[in-house]
Design a protein with these regions (language model features):
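Structural core segment of the AMP-binding/adenylate-forming
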Residues: 7, 48-49, 72, 76-143, ...
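Conserved AMP-binding/adenylate-forming core of the ANL superfamily
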Residues: 20-64, 68-72, 89-94
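Conserved adenylate-forming
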Residues: 46-51, 55, 149-159, 164-207, ...
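AMP-binding/adenylate-forming catalytic core of the ANL superfamily
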Residues: 88, 107, 364, 369-370, ...
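Conserved AMP-binding/adenylation subdomain of ANL enzymes
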Residues: 185-204, 212-252, 267
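Gly/Ser/Thr-rich phosphate-binding loop
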Residues: 251-256, 267-326, 336, 347
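Conserved ATP/PPi-binding loop(s) of AMP-dependent carboxylate-activating enzymes
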Residues: 345-380, 418
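AMP-binding/adenylate-forming catalytic domain of the ANL superfamily
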Residues: 475-497, 516-522
């Protein structure tokens, strides 16, 4: 078993003089040997501050150069990083720290945040601050000491906690996902196998996805270093700058959610020739719209692949050639999955041509151990040796599946099951729509009424126009919304995901006449 630190240490043993990390803010760049030396000094400084094996240390930071160094230093000590989304409110960050038994924290320099976090920690807990430019008033820069004082690597067991990542929190406060030491190398092995990354690929990677996201940490940062590549930090995502960095640095590999790729191709300085150095582009974490996928495939260098996973599983399914079948997925290397009846058990497998819930063998070494201090939720999601993803899939004869959407979002109207992912892309294809979400609200006649929540673009749109558009598209009549609401923007959480619970409340209030937002029934 190789830990996160050991994977990078081995890379340094193989190629000590290769460039490992390059910062976009300062002039710092480390070879692999220099990176390990820096990590050892930071680890020694942390040890002097009481951090050691098993210490839970929260980080709430962008994808900074020093954030990456910090995570490796914590792993050198056998400490457990708890990676929080830095875009969460100070109150949410403090609540998660208190709930998770966190013992120390490293944060952006913000007095209000520090005060809230300090109140959630023990009186003598370590709190360090970090910034992109290492400005005065930040304390992480002083966290260095003599690496010679460090002892040998701690002896860690397979089931010892390695990391705590957090879900996106679309239904409440994010849940802490505990990942054991065994998962680290297996997540890297799975990704490299399914993505087609042979050992020694020497990737040149643009790192703009936050390390608190499984894609950003495993899929971008760690896989790059494990493969002796170079990780170019973009400490704050900017699509204009990203275009320039891809071209100027000769970036060969990117992995991100589709929304960030859309921002790149929509930037005013975008040109296909800027992307010619790319050899491999992976996407995951959200559904991609076919026009964007087709554009990336046609205009960017290399190949585009879809990697499906969750924070809990990282990777389970993939599609090596998603163009033309963007929802199609197949089980990956040593993945065991089933599609079962909704509310069914592991043996209630659906027939080919039917939809059901995707479950993943929890015995896989990529799968999480538990939700932090949430035994009831753990028992609900880990049952009979399987992880219940909550994702709805259509099973094909050959074992492939089509990813339909979340079971939590399923609308049950008039005895039919309707998933928002069947309706939303058709709405967004209208020239007068820039964003849309489809929900179901309680209704005496239908059980649930389908309601479209729409953000209109400059061209404008009306409920009647959109209904006519859906009729012309061939969408089944029972799937068409029975009411429309128009918003300036849809509510989203810190991870950028639509807060459907907020839309439910807004729609029910508008329907009942308790809102200024118009509820336009069709």
């Amino acid at each position: 078993m190789q830990t996160c630190y050991q994977l990078v240490w081995l890379a340094a043993e193989r190629s000590p003089d290769r460039p490992a990390m390059v910062d976009d803010i300062s002039d710092r760049q480390f070879t692999y040997a220099q990176l390990i030396a820096e990590v050892e000094m930071v680890a020694a400084g942390l040890a002097e501050r009481g951090i050691g094996r098993g210490t839970r240390v929260a980080t709430a930071l962008p994808p900074l150069f020093d954030h990456a160094v910090l995570l490796l230093a914590l792993q050198r000590l056998g400490a457990v990083p708890a990676l929080l989304n830095f875009r969460l409110t100070a109150g949410d960050i403090a609540a998660l720290i208190a709930d998770g038994g966190i013992e120390a924290a490293v944060l952006l320099p913000d007095e209000d945040l520090a005060a809230e976090v300090s109140a959630a920690l023990a009186d003598d807990a370590m709190i360090l601050t970090m910034s992109a430019d290492r400005s005065e008033g930040t304390s992480f820069g002083d966290c260095r000491s003599d690496a010679g004082a460090l002892g040998p690597l701690p002896e860690l067991a397979r089931e010892d906690p390695a990391f705590v990542f957090y879900t996106s929190g679309t239904t409440g406060l994010p849940k802490g996902v505990v990942l054991s030491q065994r998962t680290t190398e297996h997540r890297i092995l799975w990704l490299s196998t399914q993505a087609g990354l042979p050992h020694g690929s020497h990737l040149r990677t643009l790192g703009f996805v936050p390390l608190s996201h499984a894609i950003g940490f495993y899929g971008v940062f760690l896989v790059t270093l494990a493969m002796n590549g170079t990780y170019f930090v973009q400490s704050a995502f900017n699509p204009v700058t990203a275009n320039e960095m891809v071209e100027e640095l000769g970036i060969t590999y990117m992995f991100a959610v589709p929304q960030l790729y859309f921002a790149i191709v929509s930037a005013p300085n975008y040109a296909p020739e800027k992307m010619r150095s790319l050899q491999l582009v992976l996407y995951g974490g959200a559904e991609i719209v076919p026009p964007l996928l087709q554009r990336m495939d046609a205009e960017w260098g290399g190949v585009v692949r879809h990697i499906y996973g969750t924070t809990e599983t990282m990777c389970s399914l993939y599609n090596p050639d998603p163009v033309g079948r963007h929802r199609r997925l197949r089980p990956g290397f040593y993945s065991r999955t089933r599609v079962i009846e909704l509310d069914g058990g592991p043996d209630d497998v659906v027939a080919a041509g039917e939809e059901g819930e995707l479950i993943v063998d929890a015995g896989s070494d990529t799968v999480f151990s538990e939700y932090l201090n949430r035994p009831e939720v753990t028992a609900e999601k880990l049952r009979d040796g399987w992880y219940y993803t909550g994702d709805i899939c259509l099973l094909h004869d050959d074992g492939d599946v089509d990813l339909i959407g979340r079971s939590d979002d399923m609308i049950r109207s008039g005895g039919e099951h309707i998933h928002p992912s069947e309706v939303e892309p058709v709405l967004i294809s209208h020239a007068g729509v820039t964003d849309a979400a489809v929900i179901g609200i309680s209704d005496a006649k239908w059980g649930q009424m389908v309601v479209a929540c729409v953000v209109a673009g400059d061209a404008g749109s009306s409920a009647d126009q959109l209904d006519a558009h859906l009729r012309a598209s061939g969408l089944a009549g029972f799937k068409r919304p029975k009411a429309y609401m128009f918003f300036d923007a849809l509510p989203r959480n810190a991870a950028g995901k639509v807060l459907r619970r907020d839309l439910h409340g807004a729609a029910e209030a508008a329907r009942d006449g308790n809102s200024e937002t118009e509820f336009e029934a069709i």
